[in-house]
Amino acid sequence: MLNLYGFQQQALRDTSDRNRVAYYLDMGLGKTFVGSEKMHQLGAKVNLVICQKSKIDDWVNHFKEHYTFNAWNLSNKKEMNCFYDDVDYVMKYGGMVVGIINYELAFRRPELLKLTEFTLMLDESSLIQNESAKRTKFIMKMKPANVILLSGTPVSGKYERLISQIHLLGWNIAENTFWNQYVNYHYDDNEGFPLLIVDGYKNTDRLIRKMHEHGCVFMKTDEVFELPEQIWNDVKIPTTKEYKNFRKSGIVTVGDDELVGDCTLTKMLYERMLCGHYNQNKISTFRDLLESTSNRVIVFYNFDAELREIENVCLELDRPTSIVNGHERDLYCYEQYDDAVVIVQYQAGSMGLNLQASNRIVYFTPPLSCELYAQSKKRIHRIGQQQTCFYYRLICESSIEKRIYNSLERGIDYTDKLFENDVDYNEADE
């Protein structure tokens, strides 16, 4: 058995008699270790882990370091063939094998549906909360003997998104029954098309109890560890005249770029950009912030244009950089240099990335997802961190960024707020 913390051992003991479990452990509490050990205890000959693309190598290395059975990267066709050779072998002669594949690729491998008598482990199971997504539909078609779900934010506080996960755990409650028992909602008439609005939740104690009965373990960091203090700094950035003009007219020219907000989505997009890479005040403030510290710094960003501006500042200051986004995952400078700047795109790096060698995060621009925002905080504030953690939010005054952060702090996706509450863009931001 792995050398586990007491609370991790307790989670395994609490679910020792179950073959369908969910470990909803707060970010940084070692879900990887708990999940892999549960998989080992279940003892299925064939095992499949589905995770984010950026986590495949981490999972492969974890199994190779701590266990004796083969672990294959199924995003590689050659290793996929080796995996199936091992499947044939262990089914005949015994033993164990595990394959690891990312969500985006799994549903493009229909042969995985032929697996039987296997353990299915979903890392960041919150990624199957959209029941109409191809990844979710594919996973729900699978026939695992055992299920292990891992997530720090299973639904980001939105219980209606639990359906697919609780069905995998064996709680076969009908969707309409779930909504009627646990969700307060109503329909708005949207020009003849009914729009479902969630008002809140009810009977949540009963819901949590039922989830416990079906193998769910919930655990927060502050229940088991005393982590260092978190200190937040909101750095006010002057908005530009271009932003103000765009708010009034919905059109503006910045350099060679003409921005036209001809609908709600494009207007929101360009307002965000005008608060980011188009705002020289923010770029200048970011430069000053980097100059004020020689420690490692993590910078979260949204758009490629922001990445270029951040890289330019780092180049000017002669700061080594590592980049984590959908195109690359290079942490060499982060690992080798004490003054490295790690530039992280939210979707690619806010989940499952351990950056605790740093104790400083800069939010160049905010995400729209409260889940990504919550996960990003834990990249440095996690088990093993010994230093006080500092967070810097670069917020353009009287702008969309203030509204976004207000929503995120309340646990609301900003896109949901726009569509469900019909935000008037002409309202003051104060």
Q: What is the predicted role of each segment?
A:
Residues 1-24:
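Conserved pre-motif I regulatory segment
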Residues 34, 44-65, 157-161, 303-304:
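Conserved Walker A/P-loop ATP-binding site and its immediately adjacent core
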Residues 45-46, 81, 119, 127, ...:
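Conserved P-loop NTPase motor "coupling/switch" region that bridges the ATPase
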Residues 55-79, 169-173:
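Conserved helix-turn-beta segment of the N-terminal RecA-like "Helicase ATP-binding" lobe
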